[in-house]
Regions:
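Catalytic cores of DNA base-excision repair glycosylases
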Residues: 3-194, 198-211, 224
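Intrinsically disordered, low-complexity, charged terminal extensions of DNA damage-control enzymes
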Residues: 1-16, 22, 183-371
């Protein structure tokens, strides 16, 4: 029995049941592929369901605003995917129909070889192989290939090999089979070789170098970046601004950084601010961010760049933030909760502590500032 046939038989018994596999709608399939880039299925499925509920068709998504799309995407990371998704939706609507071929699909914003191959094969039955991390791993181990997968030659070799293996009558099932096989059976660490239907003919298993394949020649260098944020609260309003192009988190909102207060000098605000948390670590692909957060309640509004707005503090959740900013805002809520808890209105040895919040006495476990 050959490699492809074995994979298809394994898939028939072990393939994952996923909602976007129950439809031939190219919009639903495309949406799933974009969401699942750099995202685990267990997390991505809820976002797919959210997007399908908010925007059931590509026309609905095209009519949404960028801010609405970013807000719905919040928490998934790699926000350029959301911006590209929205742009591509508008491209499709402008053209009048969904692209049907691998070549046409690649003209959409944010759609590369892998995504185009997945959509073309699954939605339209085109005989084109997908090559992603799972596929690299399965093929490298089974065929014993030590050519680095992140080189031009390596990418070409694996793409040609993958294409030679795909059965012309089942491109959708085969592509989904090899991706599921890599995710479930031939995992990056601790693969399940004892139950693998391919182990008898797998070169890496036979030669005992499973852990060394696939090979990468480059290591991502991460630089450490220190950021200082200030939660400025004035008369129930908080300063925020939307990040521009040229750096991380384009289009997302954030609190002022220390650099935004250069006109008044650090000594002016820092002497009156409270340190809420220090060196909050957030890891990105190429950067390690370490963030400090201060709380400052000045008597007068400080001068800030023109792109800042003053939002009512209670409506801050309406904006789309990067994950680091979500963590810092949660820290502010917790800090406020802790301050309130120091002013408990009624505390006895026999009673449950209460806080006086907006004129109501609430148990701490029900406190709205509890995070």
């Amino acid at each position: 029995m050959n490699f492809s046939t074995t994979l298809l038989q394994w898939f028939a018994k072990n393939g994952r049941s996923l909602p976007w596999r129950e439809t031939s709608d190219p919009y639903a399939i495309w949406l799933s592929e974009i969401i699942l880039q750099q995202t685990r299925i267990v997390q991505g499925q809820s976002y797919w369901e959210r997007f399908m509920k908010l925007w059931p068709t590509v026309s609905d998504l095209a009519r949404a605003t960028t801010d609405e799309v970013l807000k719905a995407w919040q928490g998934l990371g790699y926000y350029s995917r959301a911006r590209n998704l929205h742009t591509a939706a508008m491209q499709i609507v402008e053209r009048g129909e969904f692209p049907k071929t691998h070549k046409e699909l690649k003209t959409l914003k944010g759609v590369g070889d892998y995504t185009a191959a997945a959509i073309a094969s699954i939605a339209f039955g085109e005989n084109v192989a997908v090559v992603d991390g799972n596929v690299y791993r399965v093929l490298a181990r089974y065929f014993g290939i030590d050519t680095p997968i992140d080189t031009t030659g390596g990418k070409k070799l694996f793409q040609e090999l993958a294409q030679s293996l795909i059965p012309s009558d089942q491109p959708a099932n085969y592509n989904q089979a090899i991706m599921d096989f890599g995710a479930i059976q031939c995992t990056p660490t601790s693969p399940h070789c004892d139950t693998c239907p391919l182990c008898e003919t797998c070169i890496a298993f036979r030669e005992q170098h499973i852990d060394s394949l696939p090979v990468k020649s480059k290591k991502v260098k991460q630089r450490v970046r220190h950021l200082t944020y200030i939660f400025i609260q004035h008369q129930g309003l908080t300063a925020i601004h939307q990040r521009g192009a040229g750096d991380i988190w384009q289009g997302l909102w954030e609190l002022p950084q220390a650099k935004h207060l250069d006109s008044i000098g650090e000594d002016t605000w820092k002497g009156h601010a409270q340190l809420v948390c220090k060196d909050v670590k957030h890891v990105l692909t190429h950067q390690i961010l370490l963030a400090d957060l201060y709380l400052w309640t000045p008597q007068n509004r400080p001068p800030l760049p023109e792109d800042f707005i003053w939002s009512p503090t209670e409506t801050l959740e309406d904006y789309a933030y990067p994950r680091l900013m979500e963590i810092l805002l949660q820290a502010i809520k917790k800090d406020e909760r802790d301050l309130l808890c120091k002013k408990k209105s009624t505390i006895t040895k026999q009673s449950t502590p209460f806080c006086n919040v907006k004129g109501r006495r609430l148990q701490c476990k029900r406190c709205p500032f509890d995070v």
